[in-house]
């Protein structure tokens, strides 16, 4: 800003940043206990992700904020690569068998419907595949 002879206020307004950002100095000394505890947990439980580690911190009574702990967790590069979805191999279904003679293959199905007055009924359908004949029950 001294190069362009502009004030700090005007330069920050032009750049679209807060003036406090110029003078911000992060306090990394507060993060030292978090770093130590996270490294200890990572050594003790190598398969644990952030959620389980944070639960361990909560169980031990440490009051640290989840955002702060996650920021330190990422700085330590402890985060795991997310596993992708396991892909199933392409399946090659067998073609349907064609029956060679009558009564060799039957198809069974259940159907449900409702009458106009709201009563429901169910049907059990049996069909012979080759001829398409329906098996009929005689009600007496």
Curated annotation (Swiss-Prot):
Keywords: Plasmid. It comes from the Bacteria. This is Low calcium response locus protein T. It comes from Yersinia pestis.
């Amino acid at each position: 800003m001294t190069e362009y002879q502009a004030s700090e206020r005007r330069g920050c307004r032009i750049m679209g940043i807060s003036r406090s950002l110029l003078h911000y100095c992060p306090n990394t000394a507060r993060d030292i206990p978090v770093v130590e505890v996270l490294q200890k947990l990572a050594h003790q439980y190598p398969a644990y992700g952030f959620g389980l580690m944070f639960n361990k911190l909560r169980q031990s009574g440490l009051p640290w904020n989840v955002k702060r702990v996650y920021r330190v967790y990422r700085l330590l590069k402890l985060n795991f690569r997310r596993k992708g979805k396991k892909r199933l191999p392409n399946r090659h279904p067998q073609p349907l068998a064609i029956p060679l003679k009558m009564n060799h293959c039957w198809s069974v199905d259940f159907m449900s419907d409702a009458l106009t007055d709201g009563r429901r009924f169910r049907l059990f359908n049996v069909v012979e595949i080759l001829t398409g004949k329906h098996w009929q029950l005689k009600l007496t």
